[in-house]
From Swiss-Prot:
One of its GO terms (biological process) is photosynthesis. Binds 4 heme groups per subunit. Heme 2 binds at M130, C152, C155, H156. Disruption phenotype: Lack of photosynthesis. Keywords: Electron transport, Heme, Iron, Lipoprotein, Membrane, Metal-binding, Photosynthesis, Reaction center, Signal, Transport. GO terms for cellular component: plasma membrane light-harvesting complex; plasma membrane-derived chromatophore membrane. It is found in: Cellular chromatophore membrane. Gene3D superfamilies: Photosynthetic Reaction Center, subunit C, domain 2. The gene is pufC. Residues 1-20 form the signal peptide. One of its GO terms (molecular function) is heme binding. Heme 4 binds at H144, C325, C328, H329. This is Photosynthetic reaction center cytochrome c subunit. The reaction center of purple bacteria contains a tightly bound cytochrome molecule which re-reduces the photo oxidized primary electron donor.
Length: 356
């Protein structure tokens, strides 16, 4: 009887585990390549519906204003990023940013109500850099964001800290049961520890490929060899790349797939994953640019913020929050299902000539 109870508990636990890792049927498949080659995008209608309802909560665009009057930098003090706008454009943009980032906290989340030009609050300094980053994305990374662009809401979704940011994780020994920040579950298998993280789709792979590939631009993601033996095309200098590099690459791929809410063949050819050109889908080239965009954001905009952020906003190694694909995409192939919010706020796009 005791053994029966133990077996029943184990069965229920296993069922709960499996149910938590997979989406329930039905699933739909849209053919994306030649028939019979397993080229298709797999989606779950219930999940897609829930995400569409979530993304439909975007605050409506504020009424447009006339671009008349002197530059706002001549009206207010310490306006260093949006100083080329008119006062009306500036106030409209500031109001929108408040709705996107701190709707509960209001303007005083960033500003001192007695001195709006004061930099005493750290969000003021951070917000300035994030505005520069947003403009840089919309100006320099159109290979990835096209003309759709991004706004503060793309990542923040109504919260001061975007819901999907991550922190760098220390490399832990295989027998160390410490749980890193974004690891949801730790299990012991055959004498070593398996860390299962939502960010890598609960795969038993490298739980932090982001530090290796997205926090710097020194590491090559490509790991599949061009020949069987000897391994050609994936060497690191004169050394062959270790198996751990393959684990990290596939963990990153699992993360990208999960972040976009799609499967591998959205970008890759089912027959030959490593091939480019006509054998890959157009989305793969867009993803290639996206990886390099995220590296730029992490290295040049986010990582340097560690000097401006309080300890409560820093990771265990004293680092600022980092971005990955999920930060913007949040489970869909195009953030906000491709709806362009930049068209309503062109002030966040490429810098235009100052008002006269």
């Amino acid at each position: 009887m005791k053994q029966l109870i133990v077996n029943s508990v184990a069965t229920v636990a296993l069922a709960s585990l499996v149910a938590g890792c997979f989406e329930p049927p039905p699933a739909t498949t849209t053919q994306t390549g030649f028939r019979g080659l397993s080229m298709g995008e797999v989606l779950h209608p219930a999940t897609v519906k829930a995400k569409k309802e979530r993304d439909a909560q975007y605050p409506p665009a504020l009424a447009a204003v006339k671009a008349e009057g002197p530059p706002v930098s001549q009206v207010y003090k310490n306006v260093k990023v949006l100083g080329n706008l008119t006062e009306a454009e500036f106030l409209r943009t500031m109001t929108a940013i408040t709705e996107w980032v701190s709707p509960q906290e209001g303007c005083t989340y960033c500003h001192d109500e007695n001195n709006l030009a004061s930099e005493a609050k750290y969000p003021y300094v951070v917000a300035r850099r994030m505005l520069e980053m947003t403009r840089a994305i919309n100006t320099n990374w159109t290979q990835h964001v096209a003309q759709t662009g991004v706004t503060c809401y793309t990542c923040h979704r109504g919260t001061p800290l975007p819901p999907y940011v991550r922190y760098l994780e220390p490399t832990l020994p295989l027998n160390n049961r410490e749980t890193p920040t974004h690891v949801e579950r730790v299990e012991t298998r055959s004498g070593y520890v398996v860390r299962l993280a939502k960010y890598t789709a609960y795969s038993a792979l490298n739980y932090d490929p982001f530090t290796m590939f997205l926090a710097n631009d020194k590491r090559q993601v490509r790991v599949v060899p061009q020949t069987a033996l000897p391994l050609v095309g994936v060497s690191r200098g004169k050394e062959r790349r270790p198996l751990s590099d393959a684990y990290a690459t596939f963990a990153l791929m699992m993360s990208i797939s999960d972040s976009l809410g799609t499967n591998c063949t959205f970008c890759h050819n089912a027959q030959t994953f490593e091939s480019w050109g006509k054998k890959s889908t157009p989305q793969r080239a867009i993803a290639w640019w996206g990886i390099r965009m995220v590296r730029d954001l992490n290295m040049n905009y986010l990582a340097p913020l560690n000097a401006s952020l309080p300890a409560s906003r820093l990771g265990r190694q004293g680092e600022a929050p980092q971005a990955d694909c999920r930060t913007c995409h949040q489970g869909v192939t195009k953030p906000l299902f491709g709806a362009s919010r930049l068209k309503d706020y062109p002030e966040l796009g490429p810098i235009k000539a100052a008002a006269k």
